[in-house]
Amino acid sequence: MPLTDDVKRTIRDVPDFPKPGIVFKDITPVLGDAALFRRVTEAMAAPFAHDAITHLVAIESRGFIFGAPVAQQLGAAFVPVRKPGKLPAARQREEYSLEYGTDALEMHADALGDRARVLIVDDVLATGGTAAATCRLIERAGGSVAGLSFLLVLEFLHGRHALAGRRIESLVTF
């Protein structure tokens, strides 16, 4: 069976989570299948295998799960982007808008060099706000974003619009 079919079949729908009317796409069954998880991370890395990626930036927290093995496969440095106050050294910060209010992301100030060629990895592309803020953070730090790789894209939330002009790869869409 093709990988996309295996992933779609394995992701669990959880109705009314985290609130009524929402159908949550639970990726933990994908993580629970070691062979499938390996295939997924290999497939997330493959489109960027010849792009001279120097750094992989993963978005807290599920992006870390996929990002670490993808970074290893690409021979790239792993850089976590975290919620404020979680990183111990000097940090750069990027604020972004939410439906009601703002949030922020941080990255160590010395995590990237001026010639860093970066792949961003996360589990889900929804509205694109977090991913767009991560792109801005990387570019402000002197890096260039080669692309973004997601396990899945929720197309009905139009996250690709927030990342217009960026290379986006995903294994499945809903």
Where are these regions (language model features)?
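Conserved G/P- and acidic residue-centered "switch" motifs that form tight phosphate/ATP-binding loops
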Residues: 123, 128
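PRPP-dependent phosphoribosyltransferase catalytic core
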Residues: 2-3, 9, 132-174
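Short Gly/Thr/Asp-enriched flexible loops that form oxyanion-binding sites at enzyme active sites
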Residues: 65-74, 135
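Phosphate-coordination loops involved in phosphoryl transfer and adenosine-cofactor binding
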Residues: 53, 114-115, 165
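Short, glycine/charge-rich flexible loops or terminal/linker lids adjacent to PRPP-binding catalytic cores
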Residues: 76-119
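Active-site-facing substrate-recognition patch
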Residues: 1-53
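Residue-level signature of catalytic and energy-coupling elements of molecular machines
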Residues: 21, 56, 78, 148
